[in-house]
Amino acid sequence: MNENIDKVIEYVCNKEIKGKKINAQPLCILLGGLPGSGKTNLVKKIQEQYKERDFIIIDTDEYRKLHPNYETLRKTPEKAIVETSEFSNAIEAELIKRAIKEHCDIISVTTLRATEAIDRILYEPAIKSGYQMEACIMSVPISESGLSAQSRYEKQIANGECPRFTPISFIETSFQGIKNTIQILQRKKNNPTIRIYNRGNGENSMPIEFYNNKKQDTKYSCALEAFINPPKLLDNKSAIKKINELYKLKQSRNANSIEYQSMKRLEELFGVERDKERE
């Protein structure tokens, strides 16, 4: 495995760094949010905003596919994430190290839940190398994140992809982790820019910034308050409709008990009365 991962690391680092513009005043953006919150569209928005910068996009989910046993692992998706985590994290860490050394502009895409690792592997090394730091964070209610993650999972199965199942329990834990990260960022001496976004209306709409700690015209006292009080976009009637559709899909393929546990938790979060005939 060590030999395989070394080869993959060299491949990824060369592919991502070679030919990138070197910046005398490099920018590192910590881009995060809960699963299914719309981080992919936020990456596009940031790239559009900073057209003059040639960002390296660092996303561990993309590196999982390079695992030597990926084709076998994808047949058991509940194990694939665990089995590929160490592999993808090793690639991420080395790519960050080399990108910082070369003064490349960086967008690091994560949930932002692993506060200590983010600080140690990315934030502090970047600051010491003269980087300007920003955090751009998607904020959606846990319930809407869970619903989006479940819908994405079903689409991946239908399309024959390697599905990424995300339990609601993981989303709830991630929410606490992001809160911790925001608190750490708010205490940083260099006072990084922190921007909070919510999803626009529609699956393919661009995220909307509703908080910026460098602007005064806001109803929120700090980034943490903005993150934990996002605008609610999905009404309960629409949520119930989506939940019913998900149940039908899961029943049609005899989904496992773990999936149904997450669905029950979703019903609780949305305040929906359970249909006992579905249990």
Language model features with spans:
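Conserved GTP-binding G-domain of TRAFAC-class P-loop NTPases and closely related GTPase folds
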Residues: 147-277
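Conserved lysine of the Walker
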Residues: 39
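Hydrophobic positions on the alpha1 helix immediately C-terminal to the Walker A/P-loop
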Residues: 42
